[in-house]
Amino acid sequence: MSKPICSTGLRWLWLVVVVLVLDFASKQWILGNFVLGQSQPLIPSFNLFYARNYGAAFSFLADHGGWQRWFFAGIAVAIVAVLLVMMYRSSAQQKLNNIAYAFIIGGALGNLFDRLWHGFVVDFIDFYVGNWHYPTFNLADSFICVGAAMIVLEGFLSPANKSAKSKGE
């Protein structure tokens, strides 16, 4: 027997749309206002810097001839499918997990769109200290990392806290 969608974690899918809109808008702004390699300092240790990532996190496999585009696209589709099933199986009251899943789905879909449309992922957030620069990333990457951190955090909650959170107390 099927469950009403609003009683499942799918109730939180609106967050996926929020993540996608923020990610898409930020990348479109970069594409419309920056040339590849252009940097704009905002505050000390933080620049906007337009980069193209043909690989995964930290440009993993970026220089491997193009097959990685489809490989990482397939991984993104699989992750989205698994997380959608997990959201459907969870209660809408399990806020922390469902928000985390929505953040990861939104980020994965944002980067998937880039891979399929452009052939690369648009990165633009550049943190640095002195001459050392953290690898450039984007909002989708940020939402994926925050979602993953939320899942880890949820794993550390005591069983009493978990039951209180699921009941909305």
From Swiss-Prot:
Catalytic activity of the protein: Release of signal peptides from bacterial membrane prolipoproteins. Hydrolyzes -Xaa-Yaa-Zaa-|-(S,diacylglyceryl)Cys-, in which Xaa is hydrophobic (preferably Leu), and Yaa (Ala or Ser) and Zaa (Gly or Ala) have small, neutral side chains
EC number(s) recorded for this UniProt protein: 3.4.23.36
Active site: D123, D141
Membrane topology, from the record: Multi-pass membrane protein
Pfam assignment, any one: Peptidase_A8
Keywords assigned by UniProt, alphabetized: Aspartyl protease, Cell inner membrane, Cell membrane, Hydrolase, Membrane, Protease, Transmembrane, Transmembrane helix
Superkingdom as given in the UniProt entry: Bacteria
GO cellular component: plasma membrane
Alphabetical list of PROSITE patterns matching this protein: SPASE_II
Keyword check for Disulfide bond: no
Broadest EC class assigned to this enzyme: hydrolase
GO biological process terms on file: proteolysis
Transmembrane stretches, start-end: 12-32, 70-90, 102-122, 137-157
Compartments where found: Cell inner membrane
GO molecular function, one term: aspartic-type endopeptidase activity
Purpose of the protein: This protein specifically catalyzes the removal of signal peptides from prolipoproteins.
Protein name from the UniProt record: Lipoprotein signal peptidase
Organism: Serratia proteamaculans (strain 568)
Lineage of source species: Bacteria, Pseudomonadati, Pseudomonadota, Gammaproteobacteria, Enterobacterales
